[in-house]
From Swiss-Prot:
Changing residue 165 to A: Partial loss of propionate-induced G protein-coupled receptor activity. Interacts with FCN1 (via Fibrinogen C-terminal domain). The chain crosses the membrane at residues 13-33, 42-62, 85-105, 127-147, 174-194, 220-240, 256-276. It comes from Homo sapiens. G protein-coupled receptor that is activated by a major product of dietary fiber digestion, the short chain fatty acids (SCFAs), and that plays a role in the regulation of whole-body energy homeostasis and in intestinal immunity. In omnivorous mammals, the short chain fatty acids acetate, propionate and butyrate are produced primarily by the gut microbiome that metabolizes dietary fibers. SCFAs serve as a source of energy but also act as signaling molecules. It is a multi-pass membrane protein. It comes from the Eukaryota. One of its GO terms (molecular function) is lipid binding. GO terms for cellular component: cell projection; plasma membrane. Keywords: Cell membrane, G-protein coupled receptor, Glycoprotein, Immunity, Inflammatory response, Lipid-binding, Membrane, Receptor, Transducer, Transmembrane, Transmembrane helix. Residues 302-315 have a biased composition (Basic and acidic residues). Pfam families: 7tm_1 (PF00001). This is Free fatty acid receptor 2.
Length: 330
């Protein structure tokens, strides 16, 4: 168990992530669904839609983590709820890593081999890549859940209180720790290495092209930085806890804090969507305009602000490039 003040901080962090991540991802979901319905959607939009769905899965399960943190990490809900929550929560995290890697590959190919990319890209490729990411994450996390809940008849407790996915028997640790190590290698380090290479080449090409405008260069750098932060800040601590746990043969005390950082990716991904797609930038712009209109209506200035905001939104829509791929060189 963590001290009460640490549990309170984790509780507040979960609430902030939920309140910021849910509306932003819902806006992105609406934008990507609209783009996918158009003829011949780009593979990157299918991957971005899948990443949005992974974030929403995590956010929809986050209330159970909030209840757990509010109870000082004692689990009072049914055991099956713990199993399903853990399965979906951690599957969404590891699905995101390979989806981010897939997006980085698509971006790199789009600028490194623009002609071949435009001629060969198919929506089916995005669907296959997304399915592979989901199957890999669900398959790996299913192993961990089965080990925890079906490989023992002993109910694991912390003192007199039941915990969720925190304490294991020695027999469970013999299987869980190697599986966690494999998760760390296959679903974190490999996709991170792929992503770093692709975005290093992507940014280098974008910055070295004289015909690429300053705005597109800034978006390229922003996309790479946000993705790198996702891996290092959000996913890094949690996967390092797997390495430490394998060495110490127990979960480190700070693992629950690392899980919070993993959840943070659901609030950070909307920034990635913003840098990646013009349809999301327009959707976010319209969402902000609605908030401005509501605020101005309370102040009696709705008419003027609405007219100005509409003109600005039209300007953004006209100034963007091809919606299929913002970074593909012509």
């Amino acid at each position: 168990m963590l001290p009460d003040w640490k549990s309170s901080l984790i509780l507040m962090a979960y609430i902030i992530i939920f309140l910021t991540g849910l509306p932003a991802n819902l806006l992105a979901l609406r934008a990507f669904v609209g783009r996918i319905r158009q003829p011949q959607p780009a593979p990157v939009h299918i991957l971005l839609l899948s990443l949005t769905l992974a974030d929403l899965l995590l956010l929809l399960l986050l209330p159970f983590k909030i209840i757990e943190a509010a109870s000082n990490f004692r689990w009072y809900l049914p055991k099956v709820v713990c199993a399903l929550t853990s399965f979906g929560f951690y599957s969404s995290i590891y699905c995101s890593t390979w989806l981010l890697a897939g997006i980085s590959i698509e971006r790199y190919l789009g600028v490194a081999f623009p002609v071949q990319y435009k001629l060969s890209r198919r929506p089916l490729y995005g669907v296959i890549a997304a399915l592979v990411a989901w199957v890999m994450s669900f398959g790996h996390c299913t192993i961990v859940i089965i080990v925890q809940y079906l490989n023992t008849t002993e109910q694991v407790r912390s003192g007199n209180e039941i915990t969720c996915y925190e304490n294991f028997t020695d027999n469970q640790l013999d299987v869980v720790l190697p599986v966690r190590l494999e998760l760390c290698l296959v679903l974190f380090f490999i996709p991170m290495a792929v992503t770093i290479f692709c975005y290093w080449r992507f940014v280098w090409i974008m910055l070295s092209q004289p015909l690429v405008g300053a705005q597109r260069r800034r978006r390229a750098v922003g996309l790479a930085v946000v993705t790198l932060l996702n891996f290092l800040v959000c996913f890094g601590p949690y996967n390092v806890s797997h390495l430490v746990g394998y060495h110490q043969r127990k979960s480190p005390w700070w693992r629950s804090i690392a899980v919070v950082f993993s959840s943070l990716n659901a609030s950070l991904d909307p920034l990635l969507f913003y840098f990646s797609s013009s349809v999301v930038r327009r959707a976010f712009g319209r969402g902000l305009q609605v908030l401005r209109n509501q605020g101005s209506s309370l102040l009696g200035r709705r008419g003027k602000d609405t007219a100005e905001g509409t003109n600005e939104d039209r300007g953004v829509g006209q100034g963007e490039g091809m919606p299929s791929s913002d970074f593909t060189t012509e």
